[in-house]
Amino acid sequence: MKRSLRRVLRPEERKEVQGVVYRGVGEDMDCSKESFKVDIEGDMCRLEAFIKNRRKLSKYEDENLCLLHHAAAEGQVELMQLIINGSSCEALNVMDDYGNTPLHWAAEKNQVESVKFLLSQGANPNLRNRNMMAPLHIAVQGMYNEVIKVLTEHKATNINLEGENGNTALMSTCAKDNSEALQILLEKGAKLCKSNKWGDYPVHQAAFSGAKRCMELILAYGEKTGYSREAHINFVNHKKASPLHLAVQSGDLDMIKMCLDSGAHIDMMENAKCMALHFAATQGATDIVKLMISSYTGSSDIVNAVDGNQETLLHRASLFDHHDLADYLISVGADINSTDSEGRSPLILATASASWNIVNLLLSKGAKVDIKDHLGRNFLHLTVQQPYGLRNLRPEFLQMQHIKELVMDEDNDGCTPLHYACRQGAPVSVNNLLRFNVSVHSKSKDKKSPLHFAASYGRINTCQRLLQDISDTRLLNEGDLHGMTPLHLAAKNGHDKVVQLLLKKGALFLSDHNGWTALHHASMGGYTQTMKVILDTNLKCTDRLDEEGNTALHFAAREGHAKAVAMLLSYNADILLNKKQASFLHIALHNKRKEVVLTTIRSKRWDECLQVFTHDSPSNRCPIMEMVEYLPECMKVLLDFCMIPSTEDKSCQDYHIEYNFKYLQCPLSMTKKVTPTQDVIYEPLTILNVMVQHNRIELLNHPVCREYLLMKWCAYGFRAHMMNLGSYCLGLIPMTLLVVKIQPGMAFNSTGIINETISTHEERINTLNSFPLKICMILVFLSSIFGYCKEVVQIFQQKRNYFLDYNNALEWVIYTTSMIFVLPLFLDIPAYMQWQCGAIAIFFYWMNFLLYLQRFENCGIFIVMLEVIFKTLLRSTGVFIFLLLAFGLSFYVLLNFQDAFSTPLLSLIQTFSMMLGDINYRDAFLEPLFRNELAYPVLTFGQLIAFTMFVPIVLMNLLIGLAVGDIAEVQKHASLKRIAMQVELHTNLEKKLPFWYLRKVDQRSTIVYPNRPRHGRMLRFFHYFLSMQETRQEAPNIDTCLEMEILKQKYRLKDLTSLLEKQHELIKLIIQKMEIISETEDEDNHCSFQDRFKKERLEQMHSKWNFVLNAVKTKTHCSISHPDI
């Protein structure tokens, strides 16, 4: 369009407009869109100046409008002619941001001349905007009949074009009741048989909109096209709904009468098996029901017709309390005792929905009161649950004998109306029922009395009324089918006020069939207020056991109620083991109840809780070990408590931290028992070994554990390891001296004579050095003998585990080869065997020396890294082997004239050497090429290029990448590996060291001064290279200010809650004294905040009571609505 405007405004293409004067452009302030008005009076230059004025057009750029849209909307035909002259047809159909063309704008503004002009110029009338509206649909919506006529007369207009939701212009005409437009469309060939996406025809739309004139035209035109009025008026949509159904939904009595006069079938049912009569009955449209019933000429009983739920018209009227309609239906013969698919009569349905006018009407008409639904409930069961209960019935009905007999009638669960009233918490209904001398001892099939229901749901006022006139405590202490008394049920659901009332009335602390007391139930739910009421009444009940030996502490810990556990501990509840040898702390740990464990740790009775366990239990071990396995974060908190900082300033020289180690190891008296009891093995450093077993690196790195290991290391670990290292050096150093001082390849003995082996001449050892060499040989021999003895002892100690450690096999190789190397002291052996064993021995001696250095932190980490990288190399051996075979054999075929590749074995070895970078390109490839010795030069060099790419580049980089990744992984877990070795070392040492020595050096705690040096200069220098590094640790701040403030706010809220409850009780007493009737008098719902979750969980359980609760709480209002057409 913009290109068309530019063509219009070009000087060479400008056309003269005769007799027209352009007078400028003004803004129409009355128009909501501030559209332009352009008056053309002949001055073409001023028109050009207006179009070039971008400032005035800028405010329409958001909608992407052009001048032609506004000209069409204003009916400026001359300006439109000027704009489109010289333009293409595309300019006529240009769209704004909403998909509207100039023709849409003209139709919307009822500009007939603009529509005519645009159509004459070739505008497309069938284009639809974003709302699927064509210009014809817009004209129909605006009831612009002239525009409709112009559009329909145009040959290109599709009269049956579908718009929004599949509606044609004919459907929209019926919705507007525009009979003139309908006549125009029908004459131009609009189809009456075309439906929208819901299957509605124009006759449906006319019926729903109450368009009587359009309905008449549609039926008349249908007769002309071969459809009778009766057949046409009974067309159905996708839901099988006829026009009569839609007319009833709209509530237009005249339209309904017109449908009936045209032959609409009253008994026609839609998909939900509902007649139009059921819709009318639901709405309470008495006049419509009367009209339809009086118009029905069929043979069936239309008054008692049922829908898909087997509900009659009277059921529908009863559900929504349509009193007049129900009275009329009864008068014309409606069955007042018919039942629906759930066995509900109109009386039961009206009672469930609190339609009291209908209830009283049905009772006055003699409705049967003994009819029960499929749950066995009569209307009285439902009446007592409603607000004001029996007060809603007329007094004369309550005097009827057959109604009085219903008070003891039971449903399928054996519950009487009194059970229902007590469960719902309706004190007024309870009072009314008790006036009929109803027995409060009546039981349901699960042996529950009304008091059980009232106590279970916290109905305090109901409980007070039931217990008001009792003379004994039999009702209080009766158990149900599971042996649960009202006290059990009230405690189970956390109703502390009910529990207090029952205890005051004489309820006993009995156990149910599972051995659970009221305290067990309250602790399982975590109801601390209820527990406090019980404990204040009977303190000894804390130690009552159920059939499995569980106390209330076990229940609270299993469910994770930390506050309940804290309360029971504060009331000095005994810490006992159940039949599975588990204390409450074991149960909390196994179920990962973090808050319970933390609460127990902070308790004053923590040490007592820790000591309750059996040493021979396989699944319930020491709680510290269980804590490390299941809840390491709690163990961290416990270790934090073992760090006790001093009160001095942290920068002071006297500032110190005391580290307590009592939770990290069993007492020495238990680990060093001469005769183990009950086959229990007490190992040293038990807790640290469990940490290593479960990879608890965060615990092993805790300051307390580090100080504990440092204490062990300084006490005996460092000395023992240095002694072990020194004894190993007694064989390593002499062996090294022998290898260095003696020329390889010569056989020697104790006399210093050298036998000729490889050399062709004889040589002699310097006689001055023969004695030192003899001493070295003896030391190597003795160290090997000592090593043999040590390994044999280890075999008996470690048994099968000895053979699983590859270090032991390495030491056997060292001692054997070194002994063979020095065996010429006693025997003559060949020199080649002697020196081969010597090479093996010296190699493994120094390699094993690296493993000894793993114990030291600074150098041990690098040795661990070397070990892991070597394992990575072994994992990639498969790739090496195949590449070695591939290239080695290939080079053997191509280069077998060279000595290095003359045999397959030598070729493989040379290829392995080339893998390390020793390719020897000049001697092996280049010079043979110049001497024409290569039989296949192209293939040979191609193989060399492939080898270079695969091995030195790709494979080596792959190994480097794996090594780097493994190094990062080792660095991540290096601390765990190092500490694991330290723990293993100290564990093995403590097993071997005597008890008197351990008792002397072992410490229960240690005090560290962070601001003072811990060792002398020489010792610090030595520790820097070999020993564990010291890192300064800060003692954690356990009690933060934020926690204290939250605790203060918590107690303040409790005080406010208590004050409000007292004021509430006082106001209730004032109301009773002044005899004020309150709307809340009938409410009996005292649900505290702490038991709200428990109540919601009970309501979510599947029960037959759910239907009753839903019917009482909400009134279902079925709104019959029809989709927009």
UniProtKB/Swiss-Prot annotation:
Residues annotated for Ca(2+) binding in this entry: E791, Q794, N808, E811
Disulphides: C193-C666, C463-C666, C609-C622, C622-C666, C634-C859
Catalytic reaction(s) noted: Ca(2+)(in) = Ca(2+)(out); Mg(2+)(in) = Mg(2+)(out); Na(+)(in) = Na(+)(out); K(+)(in) = K(+)(out)
Subcellular localization(s) per the UniProt record: Cell membrane
Residue ranges crossing the lipid bilayer per the database entry: 722-742, 768-788, 807-827, 833-853, 877-897, 938-959
Chain coiled-coil ranges: 1044-1073
Residues in compartment: Cytoplasmic: 1-721, 789-806, 854-876, 960-1125
Any single GO BP term: cellular response to toxic substance
Residue numbers binding (E)-cinnamaldehyde: C415, C422, C622, C642, C666, K712
Keyword annotations of the record: ANK repeat, Calcium, Calcium channel, Calcium transport, Cell membrane, Coiled coil, Disulfide bond, Glycoprotein, Hydroxylation, Ion channel, Ion transport, Membrane, Metal-binding, Oxidation, Repeat, Sensory transduction, Transmembrane, Transmembrane helix, Transport
Activity regulation details: Electrophilic ligands activate the channel by covalent modification of intracellular cysteines; Cys-622 plays a key role in covalent binding of electrophiles. Extracellular Ca(2+) both potentiates and inactivates TRPA1; a rapid potentiation follows by slow desensitization. Activated by increase in intracellular Ca(2+) concentration. Inhibited by ruthenium red, a potent blocker of TRPV channels and selectively by A-967079.
Binding-site residues, a 1,2-diacyl-sn-glycero-3-phospho-(1D-myo-inositol): K1048, Q1049, K1050, Y1051, R1052, L1053, K1054
Consequence recorded when altering D918E: Ca(2+) permeability is greatly increased
Reported function: Ligand-activated Ca(2+)-permeable, nonselective cation channel. Involved in pain detection and possibly also in cold perception, oxygen concentration perception, cough, itch, and inner ear function. Has a relatively high Ca(2+) selectivity, with a preference for divalent over monovalent cations (Ca(2+) > Ba(2+) > Mg(2+) > NH4(+) > Li(+) > K(+)), the influx of cation into the cytoplasm, leads to membrane depolarization. Has a central role in the pain response to endogenous inflammatory mediators, such as bradykinin and to a diverse array of irritants.
Entry remark concerning the domains of this protein: C-terminal helices from the four subunits associate to form atypical coiled coil structure; this region is probably involved in binding the inositol polyphosphates that are required for optimal channel activity (in vitro). The ANK repeat domain consists of a convex stem structure followed by a crescent-shaped structure that surrounds the protein core.
Subunit (UniProt): Homotetramer. Interacts with TMEM100. Interacts with EGLN1. Interacts with the scorpion wasabi receptor toxin at the same site that electrophiles but in a non-covalent manner.
Entry protein name: Transient receptor potential cation channel subfamily A member 1
Organism of origin: Rattus norvegicus (Rat)
Protein encoded by which gene: Trpa1
